[in-house]
Amino acid sequence: KSAAEVQNTQQAIIPAQEKANLGNQNIMA
């Protein structure tokens, strides 16, 4: 993969991880 492809994949994954983390925080709170 090119660096741009890897970066695009990471940008797509990170928001999903952040949403999951926010959901976990809401459950814990």
Curated annotation (Swiss-Prot):
The keyword Glycosyltransferase does not apply. Its main location: cytoplasm. Optimum pH is 7-8. One of its GO terms (molecular function) is hydrolase activity. GO terms for cellular component: cytoplasm. Keywords: Cytoplasm, Hydrolase. It is found in: Cytoplasm. Its EC number is 3.1.3.-. Homodimer. This is NADP phosphatase 1. It comes from Arthrobacter sp. (strain KM).
